[in-house]
Amino acid sequence: MGMSLSHLLIVLLIIFVLFGAGKLPQVMSDLAKGLKAFKDGMKDDGSDNDKNK
């Protein structure tokens, strides 16, 4: 039950309306930085457990 193309377009349209064209690049940049930090945190968390065993 994944998202179809029409659902994705509706979600993108809602995001565009909420944030506007000027702020959208900044929002996407912040989201990408947050995801990268989360992934790095998950990698660091797994390596700490191996060192302590």
UniProtKB/Swiss-Prot annotation:
It comes from the Bacteria. GO terms for cellular component: TAT protein transport complex. It comes from Rickettsia conorii (strain ATCC VR-613 / Malish 7). Gene3D superfamilies: 1.20.5.3310. Pfam families: TatA_B_E. Its main location: membrane. The keyword Glycoprotein does not apply. InterPro entries: TatA/B/E, TatA/E. GO terms for biological process: protein transport by the Tat complex. The chain crosses the membrane at residues 1-21. Disulfide bonds: none annotated. This is Sec-independent protein translocase protein TatA. HAMAP family: TatA_E. Belongs to the TatA/E family. The keyword Kinase does not apply.
